[in-house]
């Protein structure tokens, strides 16, 4: 993907993030994600019903990479089975860590494929994905 297209996608999701604002409703699984190396501090609410990710909401303060990657993650994961969402997250983590991954399932998240060239930004790109993974893994354990 062209660098200018990547930049445009990242900026769009940073300036107009999807699902910003917490619901505070029952049924949402909650997780707080904090970075030790950046200003990133994001609260996530994740609604899973019948093994499907129905909604993900977020709020907090974060840099452009963290905010945009959260927005893109939300776009990709809503409507997915928990197992499929976890597979996408695992592939995203592999991409960020320069391991072999399946780019076909990453959709717009592929814009972060070069983030490893900026090691100080890797945590920003991974923060909410790892928080979501933790919540979904815990939910999957309850189901099984």
What are these regions (language model features)?
Residues 1-144:
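Domain-level signature for proteins that mediate thiol-based redox and metal-cofactor handling
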